Amino acid sequence: MKNIFSFFCLLGVITYAQAQSIAFPGAEGYGKYTAGGRGGRVLIVTNLNDNGVGSFRDAVEQKGPRIVVFAVDGTIELKSPLRINNDSITIAGQSAPDDGICLKDYPLVVNASNVIVRYIRVRVGDRHRLDSDGLGGGRYGQKNVILDHISTSWSIDECLSIYKTENLTVQWCLVSHSLNTSVHTKGSHGFGGIWGGYKATFHHNLLANHASRNPRFSSVDGTKWVDYRNNVVYNWGFKTAYGGGHHGEINMVGNYYKPGPASQHHRLLDVAEDGTGRYYVAGNVMEGDDTVTRDNHCAVTDKFSCLVDTPFPYEPINEDIPVVAYRRVLKEVGCSFSRDTYDKEVLRQVKKGIGTFGIKGIINSQKEVGGWPVLKTGKPLRDTDADGMPDVWEHRYGLNMNDASDASSYTLDKNYTNIEIYLNGLLLNR
């Protein structure tokens, strides 16, 4: 009887797992089942104001499941940090009519559960002398977050830092040019990010032109099953990856390291100073250094005390060999549906192996790279019922352009609402 009961419990778990829908086509890793705002209201950003009706902040700060779409392009000059404190939100940057959205002056902070953020730019800069991350977040109890195709740069602290979150994916993000000798209270601080969490996947991201923290693995309780795979690191200064203390458990697999003009060494990892971190390191490529590529362990400090022979549990992704990951990342990473001139130049310099900005590619101010690009603005398609789906698209798929409620219906697919089908389809046509 006990065995029969156990069988049906197991069957229920399997059925539930099979029934779960991934966040969107291409979502991978531990955060792939994040639902975001699925089934909730559609909120349309209609202006570039910092606050008020139609602003991005107004949409973010509302409660309940919600999907945020954009009827405008351009740069939003924030007047204070923009905090996602309320659960269940999808931010669909790919919905903007042309070049998309950039957040300026203050950070975007993800402190909620069940969050999907896609295809936006976060470029803080030094205008307000703000000692902060660009895109940050992570708190104990936070679950289910996926950050996808985000471009973040010009932070005075780290460009992208998120940890403490359970079931997290950061994928296809372009993290570039933190500000090194700027106004940070600790002095020079051109750092990429602090990455970690419990069941956290970081894959196919680009870390470019940071002096250190490429990345730093978080050294807080609960840093377990962190999978760092198929990422590209270019032109680090004095450190690539380090950290992972407080008994961290980290996989570093199949990443591609390309030294640039500022790179001072070919090390892959400096282990945590407290000696408690454990790391599985395998299959990483150091361009131009066959010794490190053949034997990753020779590029790890204190290798005999911290390396393990088998990987920690991880959620499989569509994994590439490192050289293929490098090519794909340069082609697809960041806010790639419509790249701005700055991202294009970063990727060109990575490909060429150069660093013409600042000192050997390490910068102290966004002024050294030309500042915020002007984003092209487009005209949104007519949307009579303001449900986020243009009339022409609703007509094509047999929906009612005078009924806003059909955005959250499952007319076209049993797993995704109609607005999700529209948003996911936009990327196929770019």
Question: What function would you assign to each model-found segment?
Answer:
Residues Q94-C102, I120, N402-D406:
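Extracellular beta-strand-rich, repetitive "passenger/adhesive" scaffolds
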Residues P107, G134-G136, C159, T181-S182, ...:
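Structural detector of coil-to-beta-strand junctions
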Residues R57-G64, I76-T90, I101-R118, V124-Q142, ...:
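Extracellular beta-strand-rich solenoid/capping regions of secreted or surface-exposed proteins
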